[in-house]
Amino acid sequence: MLIRLKKRKILQVIVSAVVLILFFCSVHNDVSSSWLYGKKLRLPVLTRSNLKNNFYTTLVQAIVENKPTDSSPDLSKLHGAEGCSFANNVAAHDSGHDSDLSYESLSKCYNLNKTVQESLREVHSKFTDTLSGKLNFSIPQREALFSGSEGIVTIGGGKYSVLAYTMIKKLRDTGTTLPIEVIIPPQDEGEDDFCKNWLPKFNGKCIYFSDIVPSKPLSDLKLTHFQLKVFGLIISSFKRIIFLDADNYAVKNLDLAFNTTSFNDTGLILWPDFWRRVTPPAFYNIIGSSIDIGKRVRFVSDDISPVSRYDPFVSNSNDYTPKERQEHFLKHVPLHDLDGTMPDLSSESGQMVIDKIRHFNTLLLALYYNVYGPTWYYKMISQGTAGEGDKDTFVAAAHALNMPYYQVRTKFEFDGFFYQKDDYKGLALLQHDFEQDYKQYQKAQQEVKANIEEFSKLDPDYTLDNGFLKTLMVNDDGSDLDIMFIHASFYKADPWTLYHENRFIGPNGEQVRGFRKPHRYGMDFELFLFNDMSKSFCTTPKSQVIKFKYFTDKVNTPEWDAMCEYLTNHVNYLESTHKEAMGEKN
């Protein structure tokens, strides 16, 4: 009996040792299995710090090693090529541009020679191979990289710290209690008063690149502007994040965002932008994604209605020869209505909800696109159209890796005002409640399925609005879905710039209201903004005003006092017109 117990204990020790060794090897990819066979390799100490260092070093090395070698072509020359009918900045509401957005048109307008395409495809493939090789971190490893659970992330630094200050106050005003991380770029470190004294009171903290990423990899990348966003998402401590641009204001409580069906189904929520998608066929070739030229699957964002409802070449296919149908799909159907492509509209990255564990590789590939964005991928994905930058790299990465995502189907709304009769000043994109949108989308799917015969008939009067957005994607009573975000990116809430650019002042010097849709988001948003700026920077004793680096050389100057007078005057005007703006009776 004693001998049997000893044998059992010895066996348990051996099994435990083997499990421990295998665990070490899974965490440290650089430890070869040959260690098990007698080679003397020193096993690194298992710490989160070592794991992070290994991760960032390997990631940056893979990005640097797979740099595209060719020079990016001149877009103006590409767009001037024979047969290119490129329509710059086709808006979501524009019609009559199907041929301009077709496979043939976008192919001719971004016609890379085969050698360059193959070169780009090779380095892209090598990088994605690294994602399934050296960077193939297990779920426990990914979770170990990010110590936090759930929270909100924004990018600060410079004037963006000032914008984040007001944005965070609005978050708390809605009742959102999720923790917040403000990512401070390397060149903007030193926001001590904001980061150490004010932010913790609002359950927030600053995250510095230099505290997370080893200095060598960080200097190798030389990140600027748009590239900082995706890297900021990666270095955030949260496993699941709501990302908000610093000028993007939530008008609904976000605490339950991670408990929604849409998020649990996909792990990545995106919102539509103002512009149609113009990514060329060359991009799909580079990422190794095939396009079925003969298969249309949507009409912009309507992928619920049968194609026969809006395309006579499908509903009456027998009336056309195979050659006529092929020409139709190649020359007259928007490329991004075809199977295998990213859906229209283009994406707007001022707000995103991301499961970083599930979409770990999506973020890493998006970083690759952003590092080489200025030289290649920004111009390739957006072809120089308005809003070019990081915004479409997230959906592009998810698409390239065949990862699930949900882009809100409901089109944004605009808020703004007419400065003069024909001079409309758009101030903000109003983005909708993503879970309401997803549930309505599922409901619409069931409605179409239950009435498939009727929906399959060709409707010569079909439009995206009357056939989908204003019929299938609205509440039962016909009302619009809720607004969730006010992305006020045009006149940013930077009091210094607003004053110097004379914003919210009419052509004759009169005060004007800019935000005209308080009924859509249930509050006087403009009054909230100006009230907060006035109290925070003017009526508060100067000794207690947060010492933002951005304001260092501006406080205690005559212009600062003039700025405060500007804010006070506009607050007084907004208060005097508040009831009228909210539709209240005196």
Curated annotation (Swiss-Prot):
GO biological processes:
mannan biosynthetic process; protein mannosylation
> In terms of one coarse class, where is the protein primarily found?
Golgi
Pathway(s): Protein modification; protein glycosylation
Q: Name one GO cellular component term.
A: Golgi apparatus
Sorted keywords for this record are: Glycoprotein, Glycosyltransferase, Golgi apparatus, Signal, Transferase
The record's function comment reads:
Responsible for addition of first and second mannose residues to the outer chain of core N-linked polysaccharides and to O-linked mannotriose. Implicated in late Golgi modifications.
The protein's name in its UniProt record = Alpha-1,2-mannosyltransferase MNN5
Q: What is the native source organism of this protein?
A: Saccharomyces cerevisiae (strain YJM789)
